[in-house]
């Protein structure tokens, strides 16, 4: 059975009229074809495939342009689309998001800055393209003014979003003849293709560790909330020993589920990323990806913390046994004096009061153990991150680009 082609995913976004269609035609030309018989993959988004070489495909998702008065709706569409891809397998993630602005309008609006910042916060690789940059050889006042506008746009984008200047690409998508008779050739295509390839590899080094941390934190807060809810909603007024025992077991089960869930999903993502990038490195470097990345695994650590919970629960139960025995001994006294009755009532009141103490103690026990498991997870993920960051991805994508050099882009 023939193995499917390696794919990188690109999302192209921008307001209506910025020249996205011209940009797509310029970069990908006749090799660009709509997938799915031209049907959109989701409302407002169409996808196309570009055959980079015999085994590598660039899949482009093209959003509809922003229409006036629909900024929030458009922003939601974009962020939801990226999020939905992040929840799929790594091969479906967007490795590059191209945000288009037009030099003709010269506008970089605040809501667009905010979209880019939100995308960057999730460790997406964002490349900014400024279209209609056809003034390189234009010595007229209009040409000089446009160059000034483009510089101001680049400065605003880099300052407000933190994007590196190297990730902002001025592009001229169509050939143009200036009034002075000089010809402006299309430019920027090779730079964009280069960034798409680089971003494919940078996703591994930057986004995968981020997603691992993000997933662990979500699981931690989710399980901590569930444990706290169980303890809070349990009444320890009657049948204290049985309830403490039952809650202790539930806490132990939650801790084990939390540890196993994180461990299994982290290992799965590590394995998935290793296999995906192994295919790339095998093709473009003719070596195993494991040469660069020895994928680690999360250790199983929940058992020792479950034992600690059980020991702490046993201590609570032992204290309850002593309290119950004290009350029982007062009950069976033959000489029921006022002092005995007083002591009995006091012991019963103390037993009732202890219900709140039990809840507080159990909450402290559970919180201490889940925090320790969380810390151990984070330490393990830190080692994974260090291992990933140590990989020589620059050599990987440089080699991939070198193999393509000389071919027609």
Predicted regions and their residues:
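Extended helical scaffolds that flank P-loop GTPase cores
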Residues: 188-190, 194-409
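Conserved G1/Walker A P-loop phosphate-binding module
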Residues: 1-68
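Extended hydrophobic secondary-structure segments that form protein cores and membrane-embedded regions
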Residues: 11-12, 60-62, 95-101, 129, ...
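Conserved protein kinase catalytic core
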Residues: 31, 67-68, 105-108, 137-138, ...
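Conserved C-terminal guanine-recognition region of P-loop GTPase G domains, centered on the G4
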Residues: 77-164
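Canonical P-loop GTPase G-domain recognition
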Residues: 134-203
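Flexible beta-alpha connector loops of hexameric P-loop NTPases
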Residues: 64-73, 140-145
